[in-house]
Amino acid sequence: MIGGIDMKRVEDIVKIVSPTKVEGPVTAVVSHITADSRTVQEGSLFICLVGATVDAHTFVDKAVEDGAVAIIASKPIAVPDHVAVLYVEDTRQALQDAVPFFYDYPASKMRMIGVTGTNGKTTTTHIIAHLLRSQGYTVGVIGTVHILIDDQSYPIHNTTPDVADLQQILQQMVDAGVTHCIMEVSSHALALGRTAGVEYDTAVFTNLTQDHLDFHKTFDNYLAAKAKLFKQVSASYQVKEGKGAVINVDDAYGQAIVEVTTAPMITYSTEGKGTMNASNLSVTAKSSELTLNYGEASYTIQTKIAGLFNVYNTLAAVGACVYEGLTMDDIVKGLRTFTAVPGRFELIEEGQDFAVVVDYAHTPDGLENILQTAKKIVENRILVVFGCGGDRDATKRPIMGRIAAQYGDRVFVTSDNPRTEDPVQIVKDVEVGVKEGLRDGVDYDVIVDRREAIFAAIAEAKAGDVVIIAGKGHEDYQILKEETIHFDDREVAREALKER
């Protein structure tokens, strides 16, 4: 055993990846597996991936120097005699096959719940985790905010980690006694095969709106990536019971997901279209109440989270927990004690007579959702501070500008994470849409410095206003061209409130 997993030798990996050629000894023990040359250690199996800009075959010498006992490659390489080389046609496929095997397929030892969609994944996963935890289960969460193993939180860099990292995390969860793992499953992860070796028991679809077209190129590709999760659950349902899908049929693309799903499903709606429906909605700045109709019964649901979008997130979580065996009475009781996820419609309170909300909304639909919620609860004006990220789908910039101007009474266009792009050009792209959407009496400012923009909006706010600071939510950094700096919208908002 190595760290809770069965010992593997190079010859065991050979059986899994079926190489076209093997050179060198195959009896060495593999104690670690990676596709990142920076993490190679004594006993590692190093897999040479060929990316868009980097070819890992160029790092073989360093990997051997750092202790690699075997290399998986698709191109001829020269290594010392004591290092094994497994030649394959597709190293990425080899990675997807070898890593889950190395970790003894940890996902098969837990209930796996996958949540996919453009918006709502984080809140939905956290509601599911809260409800399961309230019934005594030991829970793991993998998502945008963090990795959570029982009550321990760890930082994360991708919504869904790469194959090697994901399998290692899942093994840590198994070692910690986790019974249920709830994952945000991004379209990137599904398209790139990052979830290889993971068989989901419950799949949840929240919604599909414009995002990530810089990666997927077309909306059809984006939809197809999301649909993979439901095809997989449907296929595995043929051989294993206890599978289910939970699908938002109010979303324009929900029906497309329904059509590819042959596993049992719960469809949810606020318009009476689903097998689980919400009615009698009442939303305030800090809470929501609704009637949930499922089967022959109706239940009064009370939560401490606001917004129609959170009603949908709640329905998604309820559906998932039904498949996980929770009773409706337990679900209703558990929902009363759930509080907002960091950076998701998070109220910043410093005793002021107006509301300040920090939210992760970084898509057109996400921004419109929070502004619609603000419209329902505001007594006076809506002030919007937002920007768009660099090196990402540029077509959504004017769309988001138009939405901000249509709903906001005062708009502050600023930077988000400009990355390698010129922040001035990004705000100009956004400004095009702002000008198109401006209503009579609405004004806007362009303040490239995000800190200054937040301070300006809060300084201008009056009693009864709502200040929406959108785009970064829980993030505590800002990615600039030359560096990544510490930056937290919530901290800056508190500073601005204290200086008023």
Specify the residue positions occupied by each region the protein language model found.
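ATP-dependent carboxylate-amine ligase
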Residues: 1-19, 45, 319-329, 333-336, ...
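N-terminal leader/targeting and accessory segments in enzymes
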Residues: 2-97, 252, 274-277, 302, ...
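Phosphate-binding loop of NTP-binding sites
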Residues: 14, 95-245, 253-261, 377-378
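Well-ordered beta-strand positions
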Residues: 45, 70, 202, 244, ...
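Short glycine-rich anion-binding loops that position phosphate/pyrophosphate groups of nucleotides
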Residues: 51-53, 77, 187-188, 210-211, ...
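Short internal beta-strands
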Residues: 69-75, 245-249, 385-386, 410-416
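Acidic, Mg2+-coordinating active-site environments of NTP-dependent enzymes
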Residues: 78-82, 202-355, 433-440, 445
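Structural beta-sheet core signal
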Residues: 141, 183, 203, 247, ...
